[in-house]
Amino acid sequence: MVIMSEFSADPAGQGQGQQKPLRVGFYDIERTLGKGNFAVVKLARHRVTKTQVAIKIIDKTRLDSSNLEKIYREVQLMKLLNHPHIIKLYQVMETKDMLYIVTEFAKNGEMFDYLTSNGHLSENEARKKFWQILSAVEYCHDHHIVHRDLKTENLLLDGNMDIKLADFGFGNFYKSGEPLSTWCGSPPYAAPEVFEGKEYEGPQLDIWSLGVVLYVLVCGSLPFDGPNLPTLRQRVLEGRFRIPFFMSQDCESLIRRMLVVDPARRITIAQIRQHRWMRAEPCLPGPACPAFSAHSYTSNLGDYDEQALGIMQTLGVDRQRTVESLQNSSYNHFAAIYYLLLERLKEYRNAQCARPGPARQPRPRSSDLSGLEVPQEGLSTDPFRPALLCPQPQTLVQSVLQAEMDCELQSSLQWPLFFPVDASCSGVFRPRPVSPSSLLDTAISEEARQGPGLEEEQDTQESLPSSTGRRHTLAEVSTRLSPLTAPCIVVSPSTTASPAEGTSSDSCLTFSASKSPAGLSGTPATQGLLGACSPVRLASPFLGSQSATPVLQAQGGLGGAVLLPVSFQEGRRASDTSLTQGLKAFRQQLRKTTRTKGFLGLNKIKGLARQVCQAPASRASRGGLSPFHAPAQSPGLHGGAAGSREGWSLLEEVLEQQRLLQLQHHPAAAPGCSQAPQPAPAPFVIAPCDGPGAAPLPSTLLTSGLPLLPPPLLQTGASPVASAAQLLDTHLHIGTGPTALPAVPPPRLARLAPGCEPLGLLQGDCEMEDLMPCSLGTFVLVQ
């Protein structure tokens, strides 16, 4: 039975107003570590051993049967695991409506938070940490347990900055030769077979995630990113990622062998241990003194630490009931005290080993400490004492650990959520200052791993022409909807967009356009007119929309940066010596917004080619022509849903196919069409027209919902475009004559005369340049 006492003030009249701490069983709650939808994690201190623990308090009434089963399976797995680099389970308490899981507390927080604050690790330190991670994962696999959610958020750091693997919520048992079919995990760390919905072997899934983790440790960024889940899925399936200039050849080789798309060709843990990069420091770093053996924590082997049992008996805890609890894997108060005392003894012995001196004193025994007394505060009045403690005199024996376990609760209440790194550890990691130079991206070549012999092909394989300039982490992808072009460099200013809201990972995502300065396409005719102060980025061939999910919330690029055009030839690596002048530095520091969350059903994420076009969005909102947004109920130019991503995703695919096929459309001037007089060259402007005195709409619009044009109009020079549209099951209609507008008028847009120079077009119209080289008298209808 769990008794949970709330904060209560002293009775009226005493005037002190003091509050008793919140208690759960033998634990005093100190503060909140984290909150979720159905659970809260509290930092607590055991009242007997004075050890800090983490208590996960779960409201079972708010969980469905599947999630409750997941919680019970996590507890079952943690009961079977005992490893120095895996979070230990101390106690499980359950009532009708609540579940309390008491685990080890890692005082230095998540590895993710450390990387966001300090930048990436040096390869030597990353190797030490990766050895610890690898040993923990190998231990799980040896016990036929697969984790399935390995990521830096689940790698905790204890007081010695050692790794502690946590969160077995997606973990499960597996058997060799029996594939699993639960497609779960965190998208940036998930293997390709999870996105494809294929059955998989558990260890191969964890090895892919280990490759992503090692990349993040060394580079400080994610190898696979994207503004939304479909884009991320596409990049994971392609298996392409960037290699920074500072990564060694051996480290690159190991990462590439782990991040192989084909699970059958993926490296194994035994091969990882024998890899040249790992053998640079072959021995797993450990304490100078021998640590406790695994059977000290195992409940059913019958071999327990006699010193811990002796201390418990000295404190008045029934030895027989403690042994029974350990044998039955009860994980009750008796077992919790034993495990916590075992941890304190381990810390004490390691401290004795590290203490300098020619002669070390023997370990203290409880029988040698009969002159000490145990404070009885909190024990005599505890409701568990009759069942937990044996009849003892008022003066009990206290071990030498009791003096170390006593500490003030007031100081612990003022500690931050994640403890700062000790000054003695300042030289362990490579500090990364948070400066604008460290927040820039690098246009680094991407490579596709094809065929066997990855290590042999590294020096000879030339990278494909890169058509993307994406940022290196999920939160660093520019959210501007860049125009879709063939592989070429597009020079445009950086933009920033705000995250969209209210979307799901499985649907096409809405976006909110941002103001964007004018930009020019990277054609030879226009590149000569560009100033040398324009920042350089590559146009992305993927969806330019952003995601509102916590996993993939994007942030805009840094604006205002003035760099010279890129003047280097991209090869196998970005740079092996020094950065070229004007080349933006590789991001070596994660951002808080890249924190990932685990998902079930990753196989349901649809690819880019399967997105359904409902209605195209406006060119104004996509290209940042103006901050104008159409009303939600307005049809016409914006279709049924303003700002819809689905329409533009398909339109961009059509335009990409048109560019790649090098289709040219030169409409012949219709005899009945009168040409408007050519005014002086001026920028092309589209703006909303309101009021009764507005000019009539022009006859040429990019719109949706218009009736299909008759076949004769499609036979006047539009056959190449029509054939390209048929390949995509899309009706692309081109005409030069005036067309009647639908009954419900679309949002009214005014434009200047159609004879404007194409160089004045804003960035959102770059991809339309090939369709209107002569005039703007041609409209394109996508239905």
UniProtKB/Swiss-Prot annotation:
Protein name according to UniProt: Serine/threonine-protein kinase SIK1
UniProt xrefs under SUPFAM superfamilies: Protein kinase-like (PK-like)
Domain Protein kinase: 27-278
Enzyme class: transferase
Protein's UniProt keywords contain Cell wall biogenesis/degradation: no
Gene coding for it: SIK1
Catalyzed chemical reaction(s): L-seryl-[protein] + ATP = O-phospho-L-seryl-[protein] + ADP + H(+); L-threonyl-[protein] + ATP = O-phospho-L-threonyl-[protein] + ADP + H(+)
Effect on the protein upon substituting S411C: In DEE30; no change in subcellular location
